[in-house]
A protein has these predicted regions:
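Composition-driven recognition of glycine/serine/threonine/acidic- and proline-rich low-complexity segments
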Residues: 1-178
């Protein structure tokens, strides 16, 4: 399972790298079972890789024909999200224009990365997967993960992504209720 996520994100990273015109580095994927509140605690304390207190989340819900469902999340520190959008739109884009387009640009980045991952996983498992439109939310870690009971056990596949030239990092999380 870890290798499947690693392969799927490798393809998505190439697309993201082309968008921001910068090399993207990936961490080794971690796949584990954890309670939802424990994941929130780790993200808040920075144990999951030094993530800031406020994050921007790009979320899409996916379902297979046989009823399997997952939420795929792309998380970036809130302060880094504007830099990602600036890299996407180009160096000469005004700060005012970037702020106006931030939500749409983040949704598009999430759409590209998450759908590329899910498409690769669907191909790998020989399954058809349908997904929702991406939703962008910037908030505290606790609020980003409060959509289900905190004690719910979930399967988490976490892969870190970083843009070393700009000291930005984020995570792709696949959350599956078990």
């Amino acid at each position: 399972l870890t290798e499947a996520f690693n392969l799927s994100l490798g393809e998505a990273t190439a697309a993201f790298s082309a968008i921001v015109r910068e090399e993207i580095e990936l961490s080794v994927p971690v796949v584990e079972f954890v309670a939802r509140d424990e994941l929130a605690r780790r993200l808040q304390s920075g144990q999951a890789g030094g993530v800031e207190d406020r994050l921007c989340r790009i979320n899409q819900h996916f379902r297979t024909g046989d009823g399997f469902a997952t939420d795929a999340l792309l998380l970036f520190p809130e302060q880094g999200s504007l830099e990602i959008v600036r890299r996407m739109l180009g160096e000469d884009t005004s700060a005012e224009h970037i702020t106006e387009l931030e939500q749409d640009a983040l949704a598009e980045i999430g759409n590209i990365i998450i759908n590329s991952c899910m498409s690769s996983l669907a191909d790998l498992f020989g399954s058809e997967i349908t997904g929702s439109l991406p939703r962008v939310q910037c908030s505290s870690v606790a609020r980003l993960l409060d959509d289900k009971a905190p004690e719910n056990l979930i399967l988490v596949a976490r892969i870190g992504m970083s843009m070393s030239a700009h000291n930005l990092s984020g995570f792709v999380l696949f959350l599956m209720d078990v």
